[in-house]
């Protein structure tokens, strides 16, 4: 740039803010000063020897990268890389304004006047640059932009004299342009008057003069049609900023973007596909949010790895495309060492089952190394090339292995041994049953069938009798509604009733709730006379016709219609005590 010290810093900051503002980007002055000071530290040669050109700027980028490798990324300002990338893009476009601003301080008054004169002469000869008025307006615009680049930032008091001197220099340049414009305009008016004063009735001209005259006339009319009045704007408005690409991401996301450009895929997880298939687009890798990992670790620590909330967080993590290495890192970071060993064992077992199931069913064969991340798929860079189908199998096996981890302090039980207690509510039993089944197999039609079968077989006797009428046609919701009344209090009362009747608890339940229709069993009502089912006492035919009806009141007690031999009263109708019953022989004599 050829300028150092505070003056060079102000010039660089002014040019930097102007260039970025034209791209719709606003950089604070403090950030620009911080970047300039860092630039001097990294490239001390730049203020004196360098310039805003693509070659020098690429050299600055290489030195910044070398500085980061030696001192670490924390030593680099946060906005250093984004500013360097934006300026590199501007310099690649070879903007005339950038080149003019970069060399503004080295242009002398004579060189500027010669450049303006050359531009005026070129604009008057070529139509591609428009009219002379347009050319002058372009020159004024460039001079004004140059002035704004240099003087839009106020200097200190000690530099006011230099500022006024440079403003006078710009005024002189404008006066030179105005003087040349006036002289050119006067020359044109003179040619116009001479052209109008020509006697067109005089045909005494040679053919060469006629050709020259026609050429001049044609040239004159072309220029006359293109002449526009030169209007100098006093209050100039800044042009609207064009829409430009936003600044690249900063921080860890910016480092990830730069790493992807350079091919460094060490921390590329999880995998993000933007399309619906593998051919729609290339996969993009983003880091798993740290907040999600913290939430998962907190849930495991406070509620356990198999708690419903923890499993919900695991499902949220599983909604992304994670490789085997990502799942191992996540499980190792959140689970305890013992639970991690259990998870890894279950994951390997599920992966082997997946390989056996998918053998010969897919075009692309799924190997155990793909699912486990071993062998040729040991490195993360090789795992990111796995297809979506393989990543789905990896996620499914990882979630199933996580659900197989038993709660803290609970031993792994067999499903057949998971039975409902006598005083346990049916909905609590169903909750335990679902948790155990989902820990073994994923949610689906197979797990629903297994839960329904065990909900009937492993229920207690009371709930089985309530469910029996709807066992084949009802759903799990029907089972739960039927057993809502089977509370511990009801079970305790039925146990007391069975004990008072001298029956077993299961027999009493069958007689009371069998079939679930108001105490009628599956084979009909129970007869109180003979004890058989299928009829009641009044319809009992067991001893009908074998006994004769008593003729009247009992001769012994005088208060009942029964035979004397069947009398069991101890007092007669008057309250007198009765003697014991006579024997069969004495009774036969009385008859």
From Swiss-Prot:
Q: Per the record, GO CC terms?
A: viral nucleocapsid
Which residues fall in a compositionally biased region of kind Basic and acidic residues? 154-169, 178-193
Spell out the residues of the site Cleavage: 99-100, 195-196, 228-229, 254-255, 269-270, 496-497
Q: Where is the lipid attached (N-myristoyl glycine)?
A: 2
* InterPro entries reported for this sequence: B_retro_matrix, B_retro_matrix_sf, Gag_p24_C, Primate_lentivir_Gag_pol-like, Retrov_capsid_C, Retrov_capsid_N, Retrovr_matrix, Znf_CCHC
Does this UniProt record's set of keywords contain NADP? no
Citing just one GO molecular function, the answer is: nucleotide binding
Q: Which residues form the signal peptide?
A: none
Per the record, the GO terms for biological process are: viral budding via host ESCRT complex; viral translational frameshifting
**Region described as Disordered:** 154-193, 568-591
UniProt entry keywords in alphabetical sequence: Capsid protein, DNA-binding, Host-virus interaction, Lipoprotein, Metal-binding, Myristate, Nucleotide-binding, Phosphoprotein, Repeat, Viral budding, Viral budding via the host ESCRT complexes, Viral matrix protein, Viral nucleoprotein, Viral release from host cell, Virion, Zinc, Zinc-finger
First and last residues of each zinc finger (CCHC-type): 525-542, 552-569
Q: Where is this motif: PTAP/PSAP motif?
A: 305-308
Q: Does the keyword Disulfide bond apply?
A: no
Put simply, this protein is called Gag polyprotein
């Amino acid at each position: 740039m050829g300028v150092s010290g505070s003056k060079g810093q102000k010039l660089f900051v002014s040019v930097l803010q102007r260039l970025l503002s034209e791209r719709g980007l606003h950089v604070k002055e403090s950030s620009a000063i911080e970047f300039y000071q860092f630039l001097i530290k990294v490239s001390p040669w730049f203020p004196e020897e360098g310039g805003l050109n693509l070659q020098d700027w690429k050299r600055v980028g290489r030195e910044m990268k070398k500085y980061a490798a030696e001192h670490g990324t924390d030593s680099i300002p946060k906005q250093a890389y984004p500013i360097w990338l934006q300026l590199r893009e501007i310099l690649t476009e070879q903007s005339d304004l950038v080149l003019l601003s970069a060399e503004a301080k080295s242009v002398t008054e004579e060189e500027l006047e010669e450049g303006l004169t050359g531009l005026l002469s070129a604009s008057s000869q070529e139509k591609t640059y428009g009219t002379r008025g347009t050319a002058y307006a372009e020159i004024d615009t460039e001079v004004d932009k140059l002035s704004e680049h240099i003087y839009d930032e106020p200097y200190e008091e000690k530099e006011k004299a230099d500022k006024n001197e440079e403003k006078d220099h710009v005024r002189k340049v404008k006066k030179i342009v105005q003087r040349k414009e006036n002289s050119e305009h006067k020359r044109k008016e003179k040619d116009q008057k001479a052209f109008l004063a020509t006697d067109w009735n005089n045909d005494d001209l040679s053919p060469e003069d006629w050709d020259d005259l026609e050429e001049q006339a044609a040239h004159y009319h072309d220029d006359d049609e293109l002449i526009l009045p030169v209007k100098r704007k006093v209050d100039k408005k800044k042009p609207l900023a064009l829409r430009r690409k936003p600044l690249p991401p900063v921080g860890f996301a910016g480092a990830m973007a730069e790493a992807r450009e350079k091919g460094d895929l060490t921390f590329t997880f999880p995998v993000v596909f933007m399309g619906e298939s593998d051919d729609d687009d290339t996969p993009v890798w983003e880091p798993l949010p740290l907040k999600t990992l913290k939430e998962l670790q907190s849930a495991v620590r406070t509620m356990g790895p198999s708690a419903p909330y923890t499993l919900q967080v695991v499902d949220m993590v599983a909604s992304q495309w994670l490789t085997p290495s990502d799942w191992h890192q996540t499980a190792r970071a959140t689970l305890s060492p013992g639970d991690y060993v259990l998870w890894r064992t279950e994951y390997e077992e599920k992966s082997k089952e997946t390989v056996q199931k998918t053998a010969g069913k897919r075009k692309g064969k799924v190997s155990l190394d793909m699912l486990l991340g071993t062998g040729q798929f040991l490195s993360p860079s090789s795992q990111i090339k796995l297809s979506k189908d393989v990543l789905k199998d990896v996620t499914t096996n990882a979630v199933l292995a996580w659900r197989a981890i038993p709660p803290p302090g609970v031993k792994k039980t067999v499903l057949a041994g998971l039975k409902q207690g006598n005083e346990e509510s049916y909905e609590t039993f169903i909750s335990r049953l679902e948790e155990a089944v989902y820990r073994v197999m994923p949610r689906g039609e197979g797990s629903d069938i297994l839960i329904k079968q065990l909900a009937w077989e492993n229920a207690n006797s009371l709930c089985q009798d309530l469910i029996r009428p709807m066992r084949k046609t009802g759903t799990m919701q029907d089972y739960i509604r039927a057993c809502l009344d089977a509370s511990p209090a009801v079970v305790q009362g039925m146990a007391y009733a069975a004990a008072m009747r001298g029956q077993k608890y299961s027999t009493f339940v069958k007689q009371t709730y069998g079939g679930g229709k108001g105490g009628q069993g599956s084979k009909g009502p129970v007869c109180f006379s003979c004890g058989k089912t299928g009829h009641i006492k009044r319809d009992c035919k067991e001893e009908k016709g074998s006994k004769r009806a008593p003729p009247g009141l009992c001769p012994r007690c005088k208060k009942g219609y029964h035979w004397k031999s069947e009398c069991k009263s101890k007092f007669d109708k008057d309250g007198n005590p009765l003697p014991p019953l006579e024997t069969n022989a004495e009774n036969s004599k009385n008859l």
